[in-house]
Amino acid sequence: MNKLGTELANAWMKKTLVDLNGFSENEIPKNRDEAYKALNLFYEELDKKTVGWKIGAVAKEVQKEEGFDGPVPGKIFKETILPSNCSIKYSEIPYSNLECEYAFEIDQDVKIDGELLNKINNFKLYTAIDITSSRYVQSSKNKFDKLVQMYLGISDHGNGGKIIIGEEIKNWHTIDINKIKIKLKINDNVTEPY
């Protein structure tokens, strides 16, 4: 997985794409362990401070529909957090998609265990837009089945690009957060509220 991790890190830094046609079968991740090996090398090569985490495909329904075997994690770096009123150049985030998300601000070290549930109401919750991205030449990635594409996504920084943090959702634990509306302006056109 060394070649994949190194080439993905270079693609991130140089804003280029990785053509998987130049990879042998044993250089493509076939399971999560191999995907994480490439991902960890990617992070070592970049040497950037982690300020948060993104976790994609959290819902079991999404995992089943996409043919995934679990969620798709990735780190958030300081320079990838954007303010809510910003401009984005598509060339800086290739093959991107916009996804409405929530972002927790966790201002203390926590273990992911039963105690986390006791502390979760103390955390701030924000609206967010995750701008997913890919550093692969898409035609070279699309030839693989959905599960291998997921492993390639994990290796590729969890398909991470940038994230826009919106407004804090006050009293989030007492309201139906699934009914929150966002407004998004693309090329000076306001989208429909979702």
Where are these regions (language model features)?
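Catalytic-core "active-site belt" of small-molecule-metabolizing enzymes
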Residues: N2-Y194
